[in-house]
C-alpha cells in the first residue's frame, strides 16, 4: 500500500482533488512483452482524448519506480525519473530527454525495470 499511498499523495499535490480517489492504471506504448498470458489483448486509446488535469504518469510503472528510487539494492538501475510522479507536460519532457522505454530493457541491463510508462487516470 506504500506505493499507492505515495502515488495518490503526489497526484493530489500536482493535480489537486480529482474525480477518483484511486486512479485507474494504464500503460503507454506496447505492453505486449509476451510474458504475461493474462493480458492477451490491449485497448488502444489516444492520449489527447483525456483531459490533462486527469492524468499523471510514472516511468516505469509506479510499483517499480518508487522502490528503484528508494532502495539501496536498486542503486545501479536508478535514473532521475524514478520515484517521481509526472503531469502530462512533465512526462513529455522526460520522454524528450530519455525516450520511450520500447524494447531497450531487453538488451540493456541498466534498463531492466524500465519496460513502459504507467498512466494514472
Question: What feature does the model see in each segment?
Answer:
Residues 1-21:
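ADP-ribose/NAD+-binding catalytic cleft of ART/PARP-like enzymes
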